[in-house]
UniProtKB/Swiss-Prot annotation:
Transmembrane segments: none annotated. One of its GO terms (biological process) is translation. GO terms for molecular function: structural constituent of ribosome. It comes from the Bacteria. PANTHER family: LARGE RIBOSOMAL SUBUNIT PROTEIN BL27M, RIBOSOMAL PROTEIN L27. Belongs to the bacterial ribosomal protein bL27 family. Keywords: Ribonucleoprotein, Ribosomal protein. This is Large ribosomal subunit protein bL27.
Amino acid sequence: MAHKKGVGSSRNGRDSNPKMRGVKRFGGELVRAGNIIVRQCGTKIKPGANVGVGRDWTLYALVDGVVQFSHYSRTQKKVSVIPVAAETTAN
């Protein structure tokens, strides 16, 4: 039997910073070139027309336009940017 109670330190107490992932611009919204559409881990949503992929799988608009989500297959989605006239995005 131990004569003193063991002084153990907690093995918890760690947490990672939030990564703020998710959809940032929804379907039908106007975006400018370079706007982030989706922050994600892996390719949960595939890039469609006029959408680029960042180093961390961030999807962003390559042109000014309107965001459109659609189904890539039965289980996967894709996001595209439909270009619009310059007068519409200037307002």
